[in-house]
Regions:
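Aromatic "clamp/platform" in nucleotide-sugar-dependent glycosyltransferases that forms part
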Residues: 230
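Carbohydrate-associated surface elements
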Residues: 89, 109
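Short hydrophobic beta-strand element within catalytic cores of glycosyltransferases
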Residues: 247-250, 260-261, 267-270
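Conserved donor-binding/catalytic core segment of Leloir-type glycosyltransferases
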Residues: 133-151, 157-160, 175-176
Length: 347
């Protein structure tokens, strides 16, 4: 291993305990305590900040799904020396909740040597090796998420079925879902597939853990990656997909917003929420839940299907057409082929 003795792994249940932290501080004498994810998992750690911070700084890599700004997190934010945001939305949240805390923005990233676009012949070879002959010419939609309520896994299957019905595409499109179909926090996906009559390979389940290299191959094989979560801090799967050159369909919520649109360009199809609800729990008293509607999603699926197997080809086709139109028809001083005078026979 490249890090050798500089990298140590300590097994823990959950996210650790106060005693484990105290022991590691005494035995290893680290220079920085770095931790990340949802603040709900680290209240126990902030409880001993007065023991930790006199010795070394606490750096928290944070993501938050949505507004309103969670003022109930202020006590947690103030318990860090430095906060680093994963998404631009999170950066705005930290700024509003605890502006006095040192703040930086470092977005998620992927390994570009793994998640990268492959030549078209390589993509076709992956399809030939991974799919039976009857599936190779289908438009393949990919979904890579946890099977949980906010990820809208069941909604996706129901709406995908309606999309197939509406446009008569049962033998033209396929949805591959890489997830645990029996996750206790989600829906029984195999049951939904059977109930809706999607057992003829319209919806496939990928349930085994796979290497990053094989996952990148699936992104390259797919025509589009979907994420319609009603709350999403960032959305790593869609970032991996874009890194492989595969466009995305996403709900414009959380960190997904900054992935699909940037500098005036779109890297897929954004779907704007049609409704907002304020939900909450005992630990998270309030947060917006962004929901898209069925019609907008089915329209996005059909638009992606009409684009054909390669979004880049779609963009290139438009660029070539516009250049051709300009060459043949001109503009301003070079305008040709148009005459606004028409002669009509008058009785």
């Amino acid at each position: 291993e490249p890090y050798k003795e500089d990298w140590k792994v300590v097994p823990v249940d959950g996210f650790g305990t106060q005693e484990q932290i105290r022991s590691i501080l005494r035995s290893e004498r680290p220079d920085i305590l770095w931790f990340m994810t949802d603040p709900r998992f680290f209240s126990w750690l902030w409880e001993i900040e007065n023991e930790v911070r006199p010795l070394l700084p606490m750096v928290y890599y944070h993501v938050w799904d949505n507004f309103p700004a969670p003022m109930f997190n202020r006590k947690f934010y103030l318990s860090n020396d430095v906060m680093v945001s994963i998404s631009k939305l999170t950066d705005e949240v930290i700024k509003e909740v605890a502006p006095e805390v040192e703040r930086h923005h470092i977005p998620h990233a992927v390994m570009n040597n793994v998640f990268r676009p492959l030549p078209e012949e390589s993509r076709q070879k992956i399809r030939e090796d991974s799919l039976p002959e009857e599936d190779r010419d289908k438009t393949v939609f990919f979904w890579n998420n946890r099977n949980a309520r906010r990820k809208q896994s069941g909604t996706l299957i129901f709406w995908f079925k309606e999309f197939l019905d509406k446009h008569d595409l049962h033998d033209k499109c396929q949805l591959i879902m890489h997830t645990d179909p029996n996750d206790p926090h989600g829906q029984p996906l195999q049951h939904l597939i059977e109930k809706l009559g999607l057992g003829a390979r319209q919806v496939l389940l990928s349930t085994q853990k796979i290497s990053p290299e094989n996952l990148a191959a699936v992104y390259n094989m797919a025509d589009c990656t979907i994420n319609i979560s009603d709350a999403e801090g960032f959305g790593l799967a869609t970032l991996e997909s874009l890194s492989c050159g595969t466009p995305i369909i996403v709900n414009m919520t959380g960190g997904l917003q900054e992935q699909v649109q940037k500098n005036g360009k779109e890297f897929g199809i954004p779907i704007f929420p049609s409704s907002k609800a304020v939900i909450g729990s005992q630990q998270v008293p309030y947060i917006y839940e962004d929901r898209i509607n069925k019609e907008h999603f089915i329209s996005a699926l059909n638009k992606m299907y009409q684009m054909g197997p390669n979004f880049s080809n779609f963009q290139e086709s438009w660029a070539n057409l516009m250049l051709s139109v300009h060459e043949r028809h001109g503009s301003w001083d070079t305008r040709k082929g148009y005459n606004n005078i028409r002669f009509l026979e008058v009785a």
